[in-house]
C-alpha cells in the first residue's frame, strides 16, 4: 500500500487502561505525540555469556533426536501434505538464492505498483483463477494416504518457507504503515499486491466489524492484529485460499476502504460459520479453513519466508497458541478475544447483578418448583438405592419443607355398604326428561334470553353512580341531606330479629275475601258448596270411607276435594275422636285452603280450622280441622309414631309426589296396619290411581265425576324460543282483547316471574289508554303479605294478572281466573352425584302438570288455556307424569329421618317408587363418613342431633362439632351465609370496581371466613342497606341470612346446644369446617391447580376465591362444592392442615411416617377391617333377634286399646246395641 499522511490513531477505538481510567470511548486528537510508535528491530548483538551459542547447540541436539525417532516409524498424512512436500522440494533453490541476495536487498529497485483502473483491476488473469479453482476441487476429492517420507526433510523445508513468509510479512507491515500515511495526506494510490497471498498479520484488516460490515458480513470478524491495543498472544490464522485472494474488483475496492483501519474489534464466531452450507463470503473473519502449506504456493507465487530461526519458532508458537485458544474458547469468547475483558470492575459487577436478576425473573415459579422436586426426587432415589451416602446433612431446612405433611389415602368401606346388603330395588338413576334432544329440553337448558338481558340491565342500573343524588356527596353533607335507609320490617321494637314476620299469613288473612266472579257474586257460600261436583256423591263417598281404612279419591281439578272432604268428615262425627289432618305440598296452598274452609264454616281462622306451616302454627286447642304441609306431619310422626291425635288423615295432591309425601306413604301404611281406627284418604287429580291403590293393597278407588266449567285448550303453531317474551305477548293480547276474567301465567322460577311482571308493566306503559291491569307475582320466597294479595279482590274495572310458579297448579283456587298461559316449564330439584348436592334446574313439565294447569281456567266459569308449545311436543316430548322427587334428589336427610323413625332395614321400607341405588349408597356413605351412621348402619347420637336441623348433613355436622370446639357463634353465621345462594354481585361495566371492593373482605386463608367477615362488617354498620349497595352486596340476601341464623339459633337453644364465640382465633373455625368437609379435600399440584385427594379429579381455584392470586397456596384445602363451567371450579375454599385431615377423617387419610413400613400399615388396615366385621356380625344377630320378637307378637290390630267407636263394637258391661244410633249412620 502507498503511504498516507494522516494519523492512523485518529477516530479509532482504544482499549481501556484498567489502572488509570474507567472504560468508555476515547477520541484521540491529532498531534505529533499521538503518532503510533513503531518498534524497530534491534541490531543483532552477540551474547556476553555465550547464550546464543548454547541455544543453537541445544536446538541441533533436539533436531537430531527428532530425526532418530522419525526414521523408526511411518506416518499417516493427508494428500495435501504430500503435495506440500513436493512443493517444498521444488522451492528449495528459491530459499538459497533468497538468502544469498539478502545482503544486497537495499540496493535493489522494485517496480512501483500499477494504479488500478476499471480496465486493469489488478490481480491474476481469469484463466489462472479458473485453473487454481480446478486444482482445489481435485485436491478435496482425494482421500488420506500413508507416506514414509522423511519427516525431517519436510520440517526443514517448511521452516524455510515460514521464514520467507515472516520476512515478507514484516515488509508488508512497513508498506501498510507508509500507505496509511499517504492516504491521509491525500494520496489515492492503491496497492497492486491485493491478489497476492496475504500474511497472517495482514489478513485481519479485512475482517468486518459491526460498524463496517454489510448485513451479509455482520459478526464475521475473528481476530485482530497482534500489534493493536488489544494485544493477543495468538495470531489470527492465515487465510491463504486462492478463492479468498481472488475477489471481484468491486468487492476488493470495498475491502480496501475498510482495511485502512488496522485495529478491528474481535468478535465471537457464530456456529453457522463452520457449516458447509454457509455462504463463502461469511468466512471473512471466522473459523480458519484448511491451510494448504506454508512454503511456495502451487501457482508458483512466493510463500511465507522468515529472516531468522527465532522468527520461525515464534511463528510456530503463535500457531500452536492460536489452536489452543480456538479449542478452549467458550461460545467464541476467551480472555484475549473478549472486547469486555478489560472493562472496569465496577461496570462488570453492575452488569453481572443485572444479568443475575434477569436470570431469576426468566424462570417461572412453576418451573423452579418442578426443578426442586426433581432434584429432591433424584437425591432421594440415589440415597435409597445405597449407591451414594450423604456426607453433609443440610441443617438449614426450608420452613415449608419441614412443615410439609404427606398423607396416605385409603378407601375404607364399612361392611354394611360393601355390597352384601341391598337397599333399593331401583338400580339405575332416573332422568326427568323424555328426550334430551327435543326442542323443549334444549330451550329449557338455554333459558330465556329476555331474562338474561333484563338481569344485566338491572345490575347495571343498580351499580351506576347516581350523580344527581345529593345524599352522600360533599355538597349534600354541607346542605345536611342524608341518605334514607329502607325500614327493616323484620326488626322488632327491642332491635331483635323476628324471622317469622315475613312468613306469617294469619294477619293478612283476617279480612274476608270478596267475590270477584259473577258466579261467586250471585251465589251464597252454601250455594257455591252445593254447586261443586263432590256434593252430588257426598253420601256414597262417606260410606266407602266408613267401610275401608284407606280410600283413593280421584277427582278433576276444581271438583271440591280439598275444601269439602274435611267438612264432610267433620259433619260425620270423626272430629269427636281426634283431629282431621289434611296435608298439602306447599305452604301457600295450606294457608289459602284453611282460610276458605274457615269462611265456609263461619268461624275465624285459627279456631276450628287452622293451619301449620314452617315458622308458623295457626292452630289452637279447639282446632278440629288442621291443614299443614307434609313436612310438618313427618316431624310430628317423629315425636308420635302412631299419630294418636288424628282420627283421619287426608293426603291431598298425592300426584305431586314430593319427597315428604312418598316417605309419608310408607309410614302411614305401617301406622294404619297398627291402628285400625285411623282413616287414610289419598286424593289425586290425575288418573294414575291404580298405582296408589295397588301400593296400599288394592284399596277401593272413588271417582268424583266432571269438572265444573269447560276449558278451551289452544296450542302454539311453532316452538317458542323465548318463553318469557311469548308469555308477555300472549298476556297483552288477551288483556287488550277486552274479554272479562283474570289471567294466570305459569313460569318456572322467581327470576322469570319478576322479569315477566316487569315486561308486562313496561309494555302497558308504552300504550295509550290501555285498560288497567294489576300484575301480581307469587312464589314461595315472596313475603306473605304480597302472597296474600292474590286472594284479595282487585278494584272495580281492574283485571288481575297473576304470574306464578307451579305453586298455583294445585289447591290454589283464585276466584275469577278465566285465562291460563302455560310456558311449559318448571323448576325441579335434581341431585348431582358428582358434586354431591341438589340443584334447581329448569325442565319441561309432564302431561299431568299440563292438565293441572289448564284446569285452573275452569274453576269459576268457562275459560281458555294458551299453551306456548306445539301439540306434537305435548304428545311426544313430555313425560306422562313427573319423576318423583325421591328418585332425583339427595336422600341423606331421608335416610336420617327413616333411621330416626326406627326403620332399620331400608329394603323393607315401602317406597312407592324406590330411589336409585347410586343415590341411596351415596347418601348412606356420606352419612357414615360424617359419623351419623356407625359401621353397622345404625344411627349414632350425632345422627340423632342432625335430624333436627333442616340443613344439608355436612352443615348440620359443622354446627354440632362447633359446640365442642367452642366456636358455635361463628359457625352459625357461616352456615347461614352458605344457605343463601349469592351474596355479591358483579354489575356489567363495573366488574373491576366490584372485585376490588370484594377483595377488601377477603381473609387469605378461607372463603368461609371471608363470608363471616362480610356479616360482621354488615352488623357493625347497623344492618345498613346503603352499605350493602356501596359494597356490591345483595341487601335482601343478607336479611335472609339473618333470618336463617335466628331460626337455627332457636333450634340450637331447643336442643340445649351451647352458643360460644372463639373471638379472633379463627384457626379453630377452619378446623371445624375441616371436620364437616374433609371428604372434599384437595392437595396442591403445580401452581394454583389442585387435585381431589381421593379421586384425583382436577380442581381449580375460582377467580373470586380469597385464595386466588393472594400469593398463598396452601398444600391442603377443603371446598364446599364443585361447579362445572369452563373448568372444574371449587367454590368456598378453606386452607387446612394435613394433620387435621388425618385426625378428623381417619377413614380416608393417615399421615405418612418415616418409621412405619408398608407392612405395618397393611397389618393395621387388616385389624380395622376385622374389627368392623365383628361389629357387623353382632349387629346382624341383634337384628335377627328383633325380627323374631316382632313375628311372635300378633301383627293384627293395635297394641294399645282403642277408644274410637265403630259400628258393631261392644264395650264390656254394655248391651249389644249402642245407646243411640249415630245421626249419620247408614245409607
From Swiss-Prot:
Do you know which Gene3D superfamilies this protein is assigned to?
Answer: 1.20.120.1080, P-loop containing nucleotide triphosphate hydrolases (3.40.50.300)
Covalent S-S links between cysteines: none
Q: Where is this motif: DEAH box?
A: 652-655
Task: Tell me its EC number(s), please.
Answer: 3.6.4.13
Cellular location(s):
Nucleus
Annotated positions of the Phosphothreonine modification: 117
Provide the cross-link position: Glycyl lysine isopeptide (Lys-Gly) (interchain with G-Cter in SUMO2): 482-483, 504, 1166
Per UniProt, ATP binds at: 555-562
> Its GO CC terms?
catalytic step 2 spliceosome; spliceosomal complex
Annotated Helicase C-terminal domain ranges read: 727-902
Q: Which InterPro entries match?
A: DEAD-box_helicase_OB_fold, DEAD/DEAH_box_helicase_dom, DNA/RNA_helicase_DEAH_CS, HA2_WH, Helicase-assoc_dom, Helicase_ATP-bd, Helicase_C-like, P-loop_NTPase
| Ranges of compositional bias, category Polar residues | 222-239
Biased composition annotated in UniProt, kind: Basic and acidic residues: 59-92, 128-201, 240-263, 311-320, 1157-1169, 1181-1194
Record's catalysed reaction(s): ATP + H2O = ADP + phosphate + H(+)
Name the segments for region: Disordered. Answer: 1-22, 59-320, 1155-1227
Q: What keywords tag this UniProt record? A: ATP-binding, Helicase, Hydrolase, Isopeptide bond, mRNA processing, mRNA splicing, Nucleotide-binding, Nucleus, Phosphoprotein, Spliceosome, Ubl conjugation
- GO molecular function term, any single one: RNA binding
PTM Phosphoserine: at which residues?
Answer: 56, 199, 224, 1194
Which part of the chain is the Helicase ATP-binding domain?
542-705
A single Gene Ontology biological process assigned to it is: mRNA splicing, via spliceosome
- Identify the PANTHER family for this entry: ATP-DEPENDENT RNA HELICASE (PTHR18934), PRE-MRNA-SPLICING FACTOR ATP-DEPENDENT RNA HELICASE PRP16 (PTHR18934:SF91)
- UniProt subunit comment: Identified in the spliceosome C complex.
Sequence similarity: Belongs to the DEAD box helicase family. DEAH subfamily. PRP16 sub-subfamily.
From the Swiss-Prot or TrEMBL record, give the protein name: Pre-mRNA-splicing factor ATP-dependent RNA helicase PRP16
Organism listed in the record: Bos taurus
The gene name on file is: DHX38
Amino acid at each position: 500500500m502507498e503511504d498516507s499522511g494522516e494519523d492512523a490513531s485518529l477516530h479509532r477505538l482504544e482499549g481501556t487502561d484498567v489502572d488509570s481510567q474507567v472504560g468508555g470511548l476515547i477520541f484521540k486528537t491529532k498531534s505529533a505525540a499521538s503518532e503510533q510508535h513503531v518498534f524497530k528491530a534491534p541490531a543483532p548483538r552477540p551474547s556476553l555469556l555465550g547464550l546464543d551459542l548454547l541455544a543453537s547447540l541445544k536446538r541441533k541436539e533436539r533436531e537430531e533426536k527428532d530425526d532418530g525417532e522419525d526414521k523408526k516409524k511411518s506416518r499417516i498424512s493427508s494428500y495435501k501434505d504430500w503435495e506440500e512436500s513436493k512443493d517444498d522440494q521444488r522451492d528449495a533453490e528459491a530459499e538459497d538464492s533468497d538468502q544469498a541476495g539478502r545482503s544486497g536487498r537495499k540496493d535493489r529497485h522494485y517496480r512501483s505498483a500499477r494504479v488500478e483502473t476499471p480496465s486493469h483491476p489488478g490481480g491474476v488473469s481469469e484463466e489462472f483463477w479458473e485453473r487454481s479453482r480446478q486444482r482445489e476441487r481435485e485436491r478435496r476429492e482425494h482421500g488420506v494416504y500413508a507416506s514414509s517420507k522423511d519427516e525431517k526433510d519436510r520440517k526443514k523445508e517448511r521452516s524455510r518457507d515460514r521464514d520467507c513468509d515472516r520476512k515478507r510479512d514484516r515488509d508488508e507491515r512497513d508498506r501498510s504503515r507508509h500507505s496509511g500515511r499517504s492516504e491521509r495526506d491525500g494520496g489515492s494510490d492503491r496497492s497492486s499486491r491485493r491478489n497476492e497471498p496475504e500474511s497472517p498479520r495482514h489478513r485481519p484488516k479485512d475482517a468486518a466489524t459491526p460498524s463496517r460490515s454489510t448485513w451479509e458480513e455482520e459478526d464475521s470478524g475473528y481476530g485482530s492484529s497482534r500489534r493493536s491495543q488489544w494485544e493477543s498472544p495468538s495470531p489470527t490464522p492465515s487465510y491463504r485460499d486462492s478463492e479468498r485472494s481472488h475477489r471481484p474488483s468491486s468487492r476488493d475496492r470495498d475491502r480496501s476502504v475498510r482495511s485502512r483501519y488496522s485495529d478491528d474489534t474481535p468478535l465471537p464466531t457464530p456456529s453457522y460459520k463452520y457449516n458447509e452450507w454457509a455462504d463463502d463470503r461469511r468466512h471473512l473473519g471466522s473459523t480458519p479453513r484448511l491451510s494448504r502449506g506454508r512454503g511456495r504456493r502451487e501457482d508458483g507465487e512466493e510463500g511465507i519466508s522468515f529472516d531468522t530461526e527465532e522468527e520461525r519458532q515464534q511463528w510456530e508458537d503463535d500457531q500452536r497458541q492460536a489452536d489452543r485458544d480456538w479449542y478452549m474458547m467458550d461460545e467464541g469468547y476467551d480472555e484475549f478475544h473478549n472486547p469486555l475483558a478489560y472493562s472496569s470492575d465496577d461496570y462488570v459487577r453492575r452488569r453481572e447483578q443485572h444479568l443475575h436478576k434477569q436470570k431469576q425473573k426468566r424462570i417461572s415459579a412453576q418451573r423452579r418448583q418442578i426443578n426442586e422436586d426433581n432434584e429432591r426426587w433424584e437425591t432421594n432415589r440415589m440415597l435409597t438405592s445405597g449407591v451414594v451416602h450423604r456426607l453433609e446433612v443440610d441443617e438449614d431446612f426450608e420452613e415449608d419443607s419441614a412443615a410439609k405433611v404427606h398423607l396416605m389415602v385409603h378407601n375404607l368401606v364399612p361392611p354394611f355398604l360393601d355390597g352384601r346388603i341391598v337397599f333399593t330395588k331401583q338400580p339405575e338413576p332416573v332422568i326427568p326428561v323424555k328426550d334430551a334432544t327435543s326442542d323443549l329440553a334444549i330451550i329449557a337448558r338455554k333459558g330465556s334470553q329476555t331474562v338474561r338481558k333484563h338481569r344485566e340491565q338491572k345490575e347495571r342500573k343498580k351499580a351506576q353512580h347516581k350523580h344527581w343524588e345529593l345524599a352522600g356527596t360533599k355538597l349534600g353533607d354541607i346542605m345536611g341531606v342524608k341518605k334514607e335507609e329502607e325500614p327493616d320490617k323484620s326488626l322488632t321494637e327491642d332491635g331483635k330479629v323476628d324471622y317469622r314476620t315475613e312468613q306469617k299469613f294469619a294477619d293478612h288473612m283476617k279480612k274476608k275475601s270478596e267475590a270477584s266472579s259473577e258466579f261467586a257474586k250471585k251465589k251464597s257460600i252454601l250455594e257455591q258448596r252445593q254447586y261443586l261436583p263432590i256434593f252430588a256423591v257426598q253420601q256414597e263417598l262417606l260410606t266407602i270411607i266408613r267401610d275401608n281404612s284407606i280410600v283413593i279419591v280421584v277427582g278433576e281439578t276444581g271438583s271440591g276435594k280439598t275444601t269439602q272432604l274435611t267438612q264432610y268428615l267433620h259433619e260425620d262425627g270423626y272430629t269427636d275422636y281426634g283431629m282431621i289432618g289434611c296435608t298439602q305440598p306447599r305452604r301457600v296452598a295450606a294457608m289459602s285452603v284453611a282460610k276458605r274452609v274457615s269462611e265456609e264454616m263461619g268461624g275465624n281462622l285459627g279456631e276450628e280450622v287452622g293451619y301449620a306451616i314452617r315458622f308458623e302454627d295457626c292452630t289452637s286447642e279447639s282446632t278440629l280441622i288442621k291443614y299443614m304441609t307434609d313436612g310438618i306431619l313427618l316431624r310430628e310422626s317423629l315425636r308420635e309414631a302412631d299419630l294418636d291425635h288424628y282420627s283421619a288423615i287426608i293426603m291431598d295432591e298425592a300426584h305431586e309426589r314430593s319427597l315428604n309425601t312418598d316417605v309419608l306413604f310408607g309410614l302411614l301404611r305401617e301406622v294404619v296396619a297398627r291402628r285400625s281406627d285411623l282413616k287414610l284418604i289419598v286424593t289425586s287429580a290425575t288418573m294414575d290411581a291404580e298405582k296408589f291403590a295397588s301400593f296400599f293393597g288394592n284399596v277401593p278407588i272413588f271417582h268424583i265425576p266432571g269438572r265444573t266449567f269447560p276449558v278451551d285448550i289452544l296450542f302454539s303453531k311453532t316452538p317458542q324460543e323465548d318463553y318469557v317474551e311469548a308469555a308477555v305477548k300472549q298476556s297483552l293480547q288477551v288483556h287488550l282483547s277486552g274479554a272479562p276474567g283474570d289471567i294466570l301465567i305459569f313460569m318456572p322460577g322467581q327470576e322469570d316471574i319478576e322479569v315477566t311482571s316487569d315486561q308486562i308493566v313496561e309494555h302497558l306503559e308504552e300504550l295509550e289508554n290501555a285498560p288497567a291491569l294489576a300484575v301480581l307475582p307469587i312464589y314461595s320466597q315472596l313475603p306473605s303479605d304480597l302472597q296474600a294479595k292474590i286472594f284479595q279482590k282487585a278494584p272495580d274495572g281492574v283485571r288481575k294478572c297473576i304470574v306464578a310458579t307451579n305453586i298455583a297448579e294445585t289447591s290454589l283456587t283464585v276466584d275469577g281466573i278465566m285465562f291460563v298461559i302455560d310456558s311449559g316449564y318448571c323448576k325441579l330439584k335434581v341431585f348431582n352425584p358428582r358434586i354431591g348436592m341438589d340443584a334447581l334446574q329448569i325442565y319441561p313439565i309432564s302431561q299431568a302438570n299440563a292438565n293441572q294447569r289448564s284446569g285452573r281456567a275452569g274453576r269459576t266459569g268457562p275459560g281458555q288455556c294458551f299453551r306456548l308449545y306445539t301439540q306434537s311436543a305435548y304428545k311426544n316430548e313430555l313425560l306422562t307424569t313427573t319423576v318423583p322427587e325421591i328418585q332425583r334428589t339427595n336422600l341423606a336427610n331421608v335416610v336420617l329421618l327413616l333411621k330416626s323413625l326406627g326403620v332399620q332395614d331400608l329394603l323393607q321400607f315401602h317406597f312407592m317408587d324406590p330411589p336409585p341405588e347410586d343415590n341411596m349408597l351415596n347418601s348412606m356413605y356420606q352419612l357414615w363418613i360424617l359419623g351419623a351412621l356407625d359401621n353397622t348402619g345404625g344411627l349414632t347420637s350425632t345422627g340423632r342431633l342432625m335430624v333436627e336441623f333442616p340443613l344439608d348433613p355436612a352443615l348440620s355436622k359443622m354446627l354440632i362439632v362447633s359446640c365442642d370446639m367452642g366456636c358455635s357463634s361463628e359457625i352459625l353465621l357461616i352456615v347461614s351465609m352458605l344457605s343463601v345462594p349469592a351474596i355479591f354481585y358483579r354489575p356489567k361495566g363495573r366488574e373491576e370496581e366490584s372485585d376490588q371492593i370484594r377483595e377488601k373482605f377477603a381473609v387469605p386463608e378461607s372463603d368461609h371466613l371471608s363470608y363471616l367477615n362480610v356479616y360482621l362488617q354488615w352488623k357493625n354498620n347497623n344492618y345498613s342497606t346503603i352499605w350493602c349497595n356501596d359494597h356490591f352486596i345483595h341487601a335482601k340476601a343478607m336479611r335472609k341470612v339473618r333470618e336463617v341464623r335466628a331460626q337455627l339459633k332457636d333450634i340450637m337453644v331447643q336442643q340445649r346446644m351451647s352458643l360460644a364465640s372463639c373471638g379472633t382465633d379463627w384457626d379453630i373455625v377452619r378446623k371445624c369446617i375441616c371436620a364437616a368437609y374433609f371428604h372434599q379435600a384437595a392437595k396442591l399440584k403445580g401452581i394454583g391447580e389442585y387435585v381431589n385427594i381421593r379421586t384425583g379429579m382436577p380442581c381449580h381455584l375460582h377467580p373470586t376465591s380469597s385464595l386466588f392470586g393472594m400469593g398463598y397456596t396452601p398444600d391442603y384445602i377443603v371446598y364446599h362444592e364443585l361447579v362445572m363451567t369452563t373448568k372444574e371450579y371449587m367454590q368456598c375454599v378453606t386452607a387446612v392442615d394435613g394433620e387435621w385431615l388425618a385426625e378428623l377423617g381417619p377413614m380416608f387419610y393417615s399421615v405418612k411416617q418415616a418409621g412405619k413400613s408398608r407392612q405395618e400399615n397393611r397389618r393395621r388396615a387388616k385389624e380395622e377391617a376385622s374389627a368392623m366385621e365383628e361389629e357387623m356380625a353382632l349387629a346382624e344377630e341383634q337384628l335377627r333377634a328383633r325380627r323374631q320378637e316382632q313375628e311372635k307378637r300378633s301383627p293384627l290390630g293395635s297394641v294399645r286399646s282403642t277408644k274410637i267407636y265403630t259400628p258393631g263394637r261392644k264395650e264390656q258391661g254394655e248391651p249389644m246395641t249402642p245407646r243411640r244410633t249415630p245421626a249419620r249412620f247408614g245409607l
